[in-house]
Amino acid sequence: MQILLANPRGFCAGVDRAISIVENALAIYGAPIYVRHEVVHNRYVVDSLRQRGAIFIEQISEVPDGAILIFSAHGVSQAVRNEAKSRDLTVFDATCPLVTKVHMEVARASRRGEESILIGHAGHPEVEGTMGQYSNPEGGMYLVESPEDVWTLNVKNEGKLSFMTQTTLSVDDTSDVIDALRKRFPKIVGPRKDDICYATTNRQEAVRALAEQADVVLVVGSKNSSNSNRLAELAQRMGRTAFLIDDAADIQEAWVKEAACVGVTAGASAPDILVQNVIARLREFGGGEAVTLEGREENIVFEVPKELRVDVREVE
């Protein structure tokens, strides 16, 4: 059995930054550190940080006065931000800068009195945070997930309308929704640059290349990870058997027993140690040395807040 690795895969710059913010805060201030929502959607990462003293909460009311609070990489609404400001809390923001970019687009539209349409998945924390940037009662903020949603949507003023997207969507599906928006609302204005982030796009391109060669595709990522789910869906659309797994223990030998080639990738919130464990598991099932495919190089780095820029090893 041949083992192929997608390239790129795994951690993106926003996830690296968010995890570093929690780790550095723990090193500087000590436990407990409170984090609103899972800092990134990966069970291994969250469990590791929890063991070190991070407490993950959903409501600001759960945080005691005087505590350290961190917003997750997915971002928060203005209402949540204002609630935190009203409390005696030290707040650090781990929102991915590429999510913040979308927040700023929504806020600008709100100030201008433009109505805004967000393409995204209902209930996802990034969507809730982005929708929560709009505050103009004269306008409106709407969520669509599919072309069908677009055709049934009614807005107040089609002449003052803009759209944005969640950063972790399927590139292909989003293109279909944007096409529908432009047909339904010819005057609608979109962002100058696609809101779907570089890491999402690159990992989807990489899994497409992987699926062209592999019989079975394993996507390392948690069930609540939007970008990981999109990778598995893309491989399935290409006619491949694909499984979304949290770790190597999830793999069943029957999945790969007849496969000549197994492809492995990882969502943007999955650490590489999980991929290495998957490779070891596949080798137990008769796999050979893992080969990494050629792919797009990523060298983007997002800095942590200056108050947290320390060498954790020195603090520890």
UniProtKB/Swiss-Prot annotation:
InterPro entries: LytB/IspH. Its EC number is 1.17.7.4. Isopentenyl diphosphate binds at H41, H74, H124, S225, S226, N227, S269. The active site is at E126 (proton donor). It catalyses: isopentenyl diphosphate + 2 oxidized [2Fe-2S]-[ferredoxin] + H2O = (2E)-4-hydroxy-3-methylbut-2-enyl diphosphate + 2 reduced [2Fe-2S]-[ferredoxin] + 2 H(+); dimethylallyl diphosphate + 2 oxidized [2Fe-2S]-[ferredoxin] + H2O = (2E)-4-hydroxy-3-methylbut-2-enyl diphosphate + 2 reduced [2Fe-2S]-[ferredoxin] + 2 H(+). Keywords: 4Fe-4S, Iron, Iron-sulfur, Isoprene biosynthesis, Metal-binding, Oxidoreductase. (2E)-4-hydroxy-3-methylbut-2-enyl diphosphate binds at H41, H74, H124, T167, S225, S226, N227, S269. Binds 1 [4Fe-4S] cluster per subunit. One of its GO terms (biological process) is isopentenyl diphosphate biosynthetic process, methylerythritol 4-phosphate pathway. One of its GO terms (molecular function) is metal ion binding. Dimethylallyl diphosphate binds at H41, H74, H124, S225, S226, N227, S269. Its cofactor is [4Fe-4S] cluster. [4Fe-4S] cluster binds at C12, C96, C197. It is an enzyme of class 1 (oxidoreductase). Pathway: Isoprenoid biosynthesis; dimethylallyl diphosphate biosynthesis; dimethylallyl diphosphate from (2E)-4-hydroxy-3-methylbutenyl diphosphate: step 1/1; Isoprenoid biosynthesis; isopentenyl diphosphate biosynthesis via DXP pathway; isopentenyl diphosphate from 1-deoxy-D-xylulose 5-phosphate: step 6/6. Pfam families: LYTB (PF02401). CDD domains: lytB_ispH. Belongs to the IspH family. Homodimer. Catalyzes the conversion of 1-hydroxy-2-methyl-2-(E)-butenyl 4-diphosphate (HMBPP) into a mixture of isopentenyl diphosphate (IPP) and dimethylallyl diphosphate (DMAPP). Acts in the terminal step of the DOXP/MEP pathway for isoprenoid precursor biosynthesis. This is 4-hydroxy-3-methylbut-2-enyl diphosphate reductase. It comes from Salmonella heidelberg (strain SL476). The gene is ispH.
